[in-house]
């Protein structure tokens, strides 16, 4: 039976037609009732459909009869945006082959190369496919040439399809069956039933069944009711239910090596079920062939996967302080299916209680915040995103800083480091000049330029991550009229000169506006923030000083002039001294207000400053 199983994924850049191709495969195999079929079937979230992107990893089992034999095709669908590359790495652990899909109207894009690198690392069989050949602006032969050079294959080995109208999609199905190898054991077990191992590549939470782990069975088999253990967290559990995904839960009696399916664990603590962990069976003591005792811990976990580490942080606060508990519950529920999301409670005087959250990138922030607003009815204040910094203090202690509020006194810092990335930008050759100007503004290091073809090139640039999260993607798209794409990978931490920029309003520090910036950019950033605050803060009865400071030293200042009320306006005629007395009294009152008064910063002001 294993010989007729094909486990595969589809990897592509965002909007290259991956979800549409998945739809055609579901139709051809008769997996979905035509009456229930809808565009982008596997993209179940409203956000996925609206944005035209895949966010969450999906898996589905298909059956297809080819040349008189029945084949089981397990498709693990993957996202295409750079922020969700960790989802791609999870899916590729579970398959033997992948379709590399390229849009004929755009050619190879940055995320295509990144995903291809992941597939090669896993030694997967790669099926190259050019999509959207029906488009009037398709550059089919140019795309074929690029892909042929990239993979070092003959042009006639590359399939040309239209996922939209179904042209040649049947050839893709045949290629999956013919070219993708069947599952192989990762080792030769002593006992097929006992040496069971399964890789968790995703999970979701069910209030009745507990955590449901989506798994690829690597070795052995597992049945309902058997006792299992999660190796990384040493968590014991019992199989409450197991089965296939097609696309709903289809309960079965057992899963065997090569299968992709689900296991309901009954575990009520989602943090104990982590993607990349290995599930084994519980056996206190058993014997190996030599007769000596063997512990269950001698079974090694499956290699390769590393848990994703958030590198971009932002604070989330409810506009209505009474919604704090709703936000807390909502974040907890979202984390069940999103292991890269982390959060911890924090408190700021101006905003109240909220959470400092870790994300994979700026799109990840956007997706989470929109889900919180749509699914839980929350209106949020979201701080300016920042990256994680590393400092070494005078006692040689290493500290990771996720928020400006955690930044220590500058005099106690011995060394500072920030994360750097290797950035790849793919664009038409005639637009390289404009793109180089943008990249130079990042203050990184130019590495090289490689040409995919005479018309398109790849710029490789090393730069601090903080420059990437500041709308670089939008700047590159705008400069190239939408033709450029980018991808980046982490290089680790490098030395940096950083300072904490503080904002004072009427002499009072507003911690919510504090941020970590490069020392040589502090003045420009401080000036930008106080100028923006001057535009958005309402005038008071007294003049308000807006100041940017570093370590108590003021580096930029703006002033909101006092709101002028004519206290003598109701007087007419008579002695001018009466008016002067009233105005002098007003002047003294304003001076007292300025000394004792505190400016209430409206939520709108936070939103405006965080947005720039």
Identify the function of each model-found stretch.
Residues 269-281, 298-410, 416-603:
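C-terminal effector modules of nucleic-acid-centric enzymes and ribosome-associated factors
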Residues 1-108, 115, 203-206:
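P-loop NTPase switch module centered on the Walker A-proximal segment
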Residues 92, 97-155:
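Conserved C-terminal guanine-recognition region of P-loop GTPase G domains, centered on the G4
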Residues 283-297:
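Intrinsically disordered, low-complexity proline-rich regions
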Residues 15, 21, 52, 75-77, ...:
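Residue-level signature of catalytic and energy-coupling elements of molecular machines
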Residues 31-57, 84, 153-159, 177-198, ...:
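Active-site phosphate-binding and catalytic loops of NTP-dependent enzymes
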Residues 16, 28, 81-82, 105-108, ...:
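Conserved nucleotide-binding/hydrolysis micro-motifs of P-loop NTPases
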Residues 151-283, 298-315, 319, 344-349, ...:
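Conserved catalytic-core segments of large NTP-driven translation/proteostasis enzymes
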């Amino acid at each position: 039976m294993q010989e007729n199983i094909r486990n595969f994924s589809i990897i592509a850049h965002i909007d290259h037609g991956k979800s549409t191709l998945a739809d055609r495969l579901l139709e051809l195999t008769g997996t979905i009732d035509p009456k229930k079929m809808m565009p982008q079937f596997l993209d179940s979230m409203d956000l996925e459909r609206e944005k035209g992107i895949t966010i969450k990893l999906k898996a589905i089992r298909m059956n297809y009869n080819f040349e008189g034999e029945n084949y089981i095709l397990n498709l693990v669908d993957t996202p295409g945006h750079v922020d969700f590359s960790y989802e791609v790495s999870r899916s590729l652990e579970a398959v033997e082959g992948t379709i590399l899909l390229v849009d004929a109207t755009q050619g190879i894009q940055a995320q295509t190369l990144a995903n291809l690198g992941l597939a090669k690392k896993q030694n997967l069989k790669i099926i190259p496919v050019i999509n959207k050949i029906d488009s009037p602006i398709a550059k089919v032969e140019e795309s074929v040439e690029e892909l042929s050079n990239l993979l070092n294959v003959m042009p006639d080995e590359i399939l040309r399809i239209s996922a939209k109208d179904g042209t040649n999609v049947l050839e893709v199905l045949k290629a999956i069956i013919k070219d993708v190898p069947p599952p192989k054991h990762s080792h030769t077990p002593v006992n097929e039933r006992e040496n069971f191992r399964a890789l968790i590549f995703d999970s979701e939470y069910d209030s009745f069944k507990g955590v449901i782990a989506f798994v690829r069975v690597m070795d052995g088999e597992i049945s309902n009711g058997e006792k299992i253990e999660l190796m990384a967290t040493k968590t014991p559990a019992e199989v409450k239910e197991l089965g296939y995904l097609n696309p709903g839960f289809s309960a079965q009696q057992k899963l065997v090596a090569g299968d992709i399916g689900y296991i309901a664990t009954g575990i009520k603590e989602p943090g104990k079920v982590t993607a990349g962990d290995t599930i084994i069976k519980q056996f206190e003591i058993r014997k190996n062939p030599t007769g000596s005792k063997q512990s269950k811990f001698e079974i090694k976990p499956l290699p390769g996967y590393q848990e994703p580490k958030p590198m971009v942080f932002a604070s989330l606060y409810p506009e209505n302080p009474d919604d704090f508990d709703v936000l807390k519950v909502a974040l907890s529920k979202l984390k069940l299916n999103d292991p890269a999301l982390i959060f911890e409670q924090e408190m700021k005087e101006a905003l109240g209680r909220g959470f400092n959250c870790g994300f994979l990138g700026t799109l990840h922030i956007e997706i989470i915040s929109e889900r919180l607003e749509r699914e839980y009815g929350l209106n949020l204040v979201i701080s300016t995103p920042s990256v994680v910094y590393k400092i070494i203090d005078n006692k040689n202690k290493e500290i990771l800083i996720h928020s400006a509020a955690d930044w220590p006194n500058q005099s106690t810092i011995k060394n500072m480091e920030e994360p750097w990335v290797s950035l790849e930008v793919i664009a038409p050759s005639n637009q390289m000049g404009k793109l180089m100007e943008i990249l130079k503004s990042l203050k990184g290091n130019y590495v090289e330029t490689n040409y995919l073809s005479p018309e398109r090139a790849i710029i490789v640039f090393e730069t601090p991550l903080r420059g990437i999260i500041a709308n670089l993607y939008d700047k590159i798209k705008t400069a190239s009229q939408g033709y450029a794409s980018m991808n980046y990978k982490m290089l680790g931490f490098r030395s940096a000169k950083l300072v904490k920029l503080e904002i004072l309003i009427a002499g009072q520090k507003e911690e919510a506006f504090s941020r970590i910036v490069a020392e040589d950019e502090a003045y420009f950033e401080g000036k930008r923030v106080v100028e923006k605050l001057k535009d958005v803060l309402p005038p008071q009865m007294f003049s308000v000083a807006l100041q940017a400071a570093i370590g108590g030293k003021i580096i930029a200042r703006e002033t909101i002039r006092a709101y002028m009320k004519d206290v003598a306006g109701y007087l007419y005629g008579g002695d001018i001294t009466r008016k002067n007395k009233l105005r002098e009294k007003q002047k003294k009152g304003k001076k007292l207000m300025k000394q004792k008064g505190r400016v209430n910063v409206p939520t709108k002001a936070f939103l405006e400053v965080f947005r720039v």
